[in-house]
């Protein structure tokens, strides 16, 4: 028996409907901010991802060569592809661009709960705005999208200017080593690394910055930074907008990627793999041959959101099972067409069952049975049976449709 590839999943109808219902809530949340959906190819030129992340990322990617000898990769994330699309298709479009996406990505890593080789991201990119209000809007947008799902989570917001100010005397390689320790909260390893660099004096400042939770503390620890007013404005806008967050100036990922504001979101019940949101301000376009445009965005790990939510019950459509005899089939086909035109799911028997067997099947799969025999067909009517209450009525098709719709509205 052929099995699905490791790290992938099948979604049966109930789960798929639950996923679509949560996805729809997120889409509606970002739509209200004016963000419009875009779509990029599932595979891109390999260079799109190695330019920013280096050749090492190839170990985590699905890479292949096509028949023309081109090196391609299944996308491991969406942001780079969206910026590539901006350069190719929308460089002269009026700014800012408010784009969102929902798409699957692929990474070759060890599968575990909340981590898959094929996974879905919901995200947004704001391209061409470089203000405190732009930073704040993207954070508010991410918060609205996650709050719409009903997931229980916490938002942490920081700014890399503080960390960069403390690490200014270190070369990029040394900065990455320090940030790796901070990312893992490995303070013992941090102290050893700084001692080896003869920078032990930084240890107390870095540890204090990671642990501080107010702007005043952060400014006191890191000293004067050029972005002081911008940071204060961003946090002020978030406060005025009622966004619930905590400050975290120890966010240590992406020091060589993000340019300023950064934020992360964590679900309360996912254990070690609890990050469901990551985002911040960045500049990527110039790496891909475009202008040096300011951008800000985020990605939500949709699969982890679904795991955190647990069992989700999507609203179910009312289903009408069309039950008919051979003599009533022509009229039944017409009635089914009317039900569907009215937006009601109508299912006909395809198995050649008798009337009793059709009713038995409908009782397991439908809310109403629309029974049509020769008598009903001759009279242009149907016998509508509520399969939950057992109540049945003889009605014309329009009245039956109204009855079923009224049930669905309750």
Curated annotation (Swiss-Prot):
Chief location: cytoplasm
Keyword Amino-acid biosynthesis: no
GO BP, sorted A to Z: histidyl-tRNA aminoacylation; L-histidine biosynthetic process
SUPFAM superfamilies referenced in this protein's UniProt entry, alphabetically: Class II aaRS ABD-related (SSF52954), Class II aaRS and biotin synthetases (SSF55681)
Location(s) in or outside the cell: Cytoplasm
EC number(s) on file: 6.1.1.21
UniProtKB keywords: Aminoacyl-tRNA synthetase, ATP-binding, Cytoplasm, Ligase, Nucleotide-binding, Protein biosynthesis
Catalyzed reactions: tRNA(His) + L-histidine + ATP = L-histidyl-tRNA(His) + AMP + diphosphate + H(+)
GO cellular component: cytoplasm
InterPro entries found in the cross-reference section: aa-tRNA-synth_II, aa-tRNA-synth_II/BPL/LPL, Anticodon-bd, Anticodon-bd_dom_sf, His-tRNA-ligase, HisRS-like_core, HisRS/HisZ, HisRS_anticodon
Top enzyme class: ligase
Domain of life: Archaea
A molecular function (GO) term: histidine-tRNA ligase activity
Similarity section: Belongs to the class-II aminoacyl-tRNA synthetase family.
Designated name of the protein: Histidine--tRNA ligase
Organism: Methanoregula boonei (strain DSM 21154 / JCM 14090 / 6A8)
Encoding gene per record: hisS
């Amino acid at each position: 028996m052929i099995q699905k590839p490791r790290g992938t999943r099948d979604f049966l109808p109930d789960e798929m409907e639950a996923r679509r219902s949560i996805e729809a809530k997120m889409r509606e949340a970002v739509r209200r901010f004016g963000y419009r959906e875009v779509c990029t190819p599932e595979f891109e030129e390999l260079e799109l991802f190695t330019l920013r992340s280096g050749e090492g990322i190839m170990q985590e990617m699905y890479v292949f060569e096509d028949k023309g000898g081109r090196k391609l990769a299944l996308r491991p994330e969406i942001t780079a592809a969206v910026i590539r699309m901006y350069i190719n298709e929308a460089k002269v479009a009026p700014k800012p661009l408010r784009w969102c996406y929902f798409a699957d990505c692929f990474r070759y890593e060890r599968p575990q709960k909340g981590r898959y080789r094929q996974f879905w991201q919901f995200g947004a990119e704001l391209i061409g705005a470089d203000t405190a209000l732009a930073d704040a809007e993207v954070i508010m947008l991410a918060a609205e999208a996650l709050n719409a799902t009903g997931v229980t989570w916490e938002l942490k917001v920081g700014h890399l200017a503080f960390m960069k100010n403390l690490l200014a005397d270190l070369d990029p390689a040394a900065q990455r080593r320090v940030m790796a320790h901070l990312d893992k909260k490995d303070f013992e390893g941090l102290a050893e690394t700084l001692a080896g660099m003869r920078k032990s004096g930084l240890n107390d400042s870095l540890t204090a910055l990671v642990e501080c939770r107010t702007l005043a503390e952060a400014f006191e620890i890191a000293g004067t930074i050029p972005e002081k007013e911008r940071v204060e404005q961003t946090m002020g806008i978030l406060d005025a907008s009622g966004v619930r967050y905590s400050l975290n100036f120890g966010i240590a990922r992406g020091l060589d990627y993000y340019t300023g504001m950064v934020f992360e979101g964590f679900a309360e019940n996912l254990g070690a793999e609890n990050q469901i949101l990551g985002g911040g301000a960045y500049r990527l376009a110039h790496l891909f041959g475009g202008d040096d445009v300011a951008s800000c965005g985020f990605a939500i790990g949709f699969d982890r959101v679904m795991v955190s939510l647990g069992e989700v019950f999507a609203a179910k459509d009312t289903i009408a099972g069309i039950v008919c005899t051979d003599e009533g089939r022509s009229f039944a086909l017409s009635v089914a067409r009317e039900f569907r035109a009215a937006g009601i799911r109508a299912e006909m028997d395809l198995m050649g069952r008798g009337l009793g067997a059709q009713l038995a099947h409908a009782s397991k799969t439908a809310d109403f049975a629309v029974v049509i025999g020769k008598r009903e067909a001759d009279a242009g009517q149907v016998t509508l049976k509520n399969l939950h209450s057992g109540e049945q009525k003889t009605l014309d098709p329009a009245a039956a449709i109204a009855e079923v719709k009224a049930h669905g509205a309750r």
